[in-house]
Structure formats: structure tokens, C-alpha cells
């Protein structure tokens, strides 16, 4: 029993001495590292060993480069943050965030994945009437010659203007110059006209200095004056303007005049 006690005391003293020797060891002294950079015999401190043999400046340089995000990484991080906020409902977005990255659409366009609506300029009013094989062309030319003889026209009437006004004056309803339907039709003609039409109808000096909008407005007012004269002429001479359709007010005027001539006056 006593022998076991002495043995325990001896072991305790031995462990205490070993611990003291370890504490007194200089950890800054160099030692050999066979597997480190430089091969066998390279002297490294413990801290340098943890850096794989790199100097402190090199380690700092690598650490700085690793902490700097590339541009694409920053973009992905920002998108991830936006989607995270949206999923958590923290506010800041009323709709799903859009991608900040540029997308190359050339491949999608070539495959027909993205279609673009192609618009073409509208055809000019009554352009179809001027085809030489159109059976109505002789009648339009006759009306054109009749309208050109109307006194006090603001400018020389074109065939397009004559055909348009010939149709409007025979409308069943709304053929008066002051109606919205007439104004809208004349405005559309002014908007679809080209520079050649403006040069023909307007003062040459005005055309040189005016903008497109100013020329359209001036031409529109000229068309209004022209139609007012056509309207007055046709109601004074319905036989020269009627399209011979039953719905035409001019045709009804002609039929009414014929009825008055055929029927004898009523006497009491």
C-alpha cells in the first residue's frame, strides 16, 4: 500500500517537470519542414508554416485578392439579395426584380423566339381608284374637271381631293362641312399627304420655312375651305355631283325635283 503511494508521487513529479520544460520552449525558433515550399531544409517559423511557406506580404496580397469580388459576382450577389428580400416579404419591391445582367438576344431572334411587329406606312387615301383598269376612273376624271371649275378654290384641286370630296358630299348622313365626320376625313388626308402635295397646294415660300406640322395644319384649313365650296356647289347643282345611289342626299334632291315637274300643281 505504501509502495503504491510512493509510485504515484513519483509519476506526478515527473509530469510536472515535463510541463515546465514545454512551457519554456521558444516557439519562435525555426524548424525543418520537408513538405513545405522550398523542399527539404527550408527553415520556417510556425506562423510561416501555416501560410504554406509564403511571406507575410504575399499572404496579405492573396488575402486581398480573394476578398475583392469580380463585377459578375457583385451582380449575382445583388440579384440574390433582391430575390431574398422578395421571398421574405421585407418590402422594397412591388414586383419581381429584373435581372441586371445584359442578355444577348441575337440567338433568340435568329431562332424566332422573339418577334417584332413590323409596321408599314398607310397607303394614301383613294390610291386604289387611280388604277387605269378601274371602271370608275372615267367618272372620277369627269367629276374632277367639274370641281376644278368651281370659283374661288384655295388651290388647284388634285384628283385625290376630288374623289374624296365627291364621296363625302354623297354621304347619307353627316356631309355638312361642320360635322366631325367630315373634319376627321379631311384631317386624315392632310396627315397622309407628302411634300409634293404641300408644294402644290401651299405657298412655296411658306413650304420652305414651315415645319411638317405647320404644313399639315395649313393644308388642312385649305381642304376645309375647298370642301365648303364643293358642298355649296353640289347642293346648287346636284346633277353634276350625284353618285346615283339611293342613299345619296343629292340623288334624293334630283328625284324630288323630277317629281315636282311631273306632278301638276295642286289647285283649289
Curated annotation (Swiss-Prot):
Domain of life: Eukaryota
UniProt gene name: RxLR5
Family to which this protein belongs: Belongs to the RxLR effector family.
Organism: Plasmopara viticola
Cellular-component GO terms for this entry: extracellular region; host cell nucleus
Keywords: Glycoprotein, Host nucleus, Secreted, Signal, Virulence
Signal peptide limits: 1-21
UniProt induction comment: Expression is up-regulated at later stages of infection.
Record remark: domains: The RxLR-dEER motif acts to carry the protein into the host cell cytoplasm through binding to cell surface phosphatidylinositol-3-phosphate.
Disulfide partners: none
Motif mapping: RxLR-dEER: 48-63
Location of the protein in the cell: Secreted; Host nucleus
Function: Effector that acts as a broad suppressor of cell death to interrupt plant immunity. Inhibits cell death induced by cell death-inducing proteins, including the PAMP elicitor INF1 from P.infestans.
Carbohydrate-modified residues: 104
Designated name of the protein: Secreted RxLR effector protein 5
Amino acid at each position: 500500500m505504501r509502495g503504491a503511494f510512493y509510485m504515484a508521487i513519483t509519476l506526478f513529479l515527473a509530469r510536472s517537470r515535463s510541463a515546465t520544460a514545454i512551457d519554456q520552449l521558444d516557439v519562435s525558433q525555426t524548424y525543418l519542414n520537408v513538405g513545405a515550399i522550398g523542399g527539404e531544409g527550408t527553415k520556417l517559423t510556425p506562423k510561416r508554416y501555416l501560410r504554406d511557406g509564403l511571406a507575410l506580404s504575399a499572404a496579405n496580397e492573396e488575402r486581398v485578392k480573394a476578398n475583392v469580388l469580380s463585377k459578375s459576382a457583385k451582380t449575382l450577389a445583388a440579384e440574390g439579395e433582391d430575390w431574398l428580400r422578395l421571398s421574405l416579404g421585407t418590402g422594397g419591391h412591388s414586383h419581381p426584380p429584373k435581372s441586371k445582367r445584359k442578355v444577348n438576344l441575337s440567338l433568340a431572334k435568329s431562332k424566332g423566339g422573339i418577334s417584332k411587329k413590323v409596321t408599314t406606312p398607310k397607303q394614301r387615301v383613294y390610291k386604289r381608284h387611280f388604277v387605269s383598269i378601274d371602271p370608275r376612273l372615267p367618272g372620277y376624271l369627269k367629276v374632277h374637271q367639274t370641281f376644278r371649275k368651281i370659283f374661288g378654290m384655295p388651290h388647284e384641286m388634285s384628283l385625290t381631293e376630288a374623289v374624296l370630296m365627291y364621296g363625302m358630299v354623297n354621304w347619307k348622313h353627316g356631309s355638312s362641312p361642320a360635322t366631325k365626320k367630315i373634319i376627321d376625313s379631311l384631317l386624315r388626308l392632310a396627315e397622309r399627304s407628302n411634300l409634293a402635295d404641300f408644294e402644290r397646294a401651299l405657298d412655296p415660300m411658306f413650304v420652305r420655312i414651315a415645319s411638317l406640322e405647320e404644313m399639315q395644319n395649313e393644308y388642312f384649313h385649305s381642304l376645309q375651305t375647298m370642301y365648303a365650296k364643293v358642298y355649296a356647289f353640289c347642293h346648287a347643282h346636284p346633277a353634276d355631283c350625284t353618285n346615283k345611289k339611293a342613299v345619296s342626299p343629292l340623288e334624293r334632291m334630283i328625284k324630288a325635283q323630277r317629281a315636282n315637274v311631273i306632278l301638276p300643281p295642286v289647285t283649289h
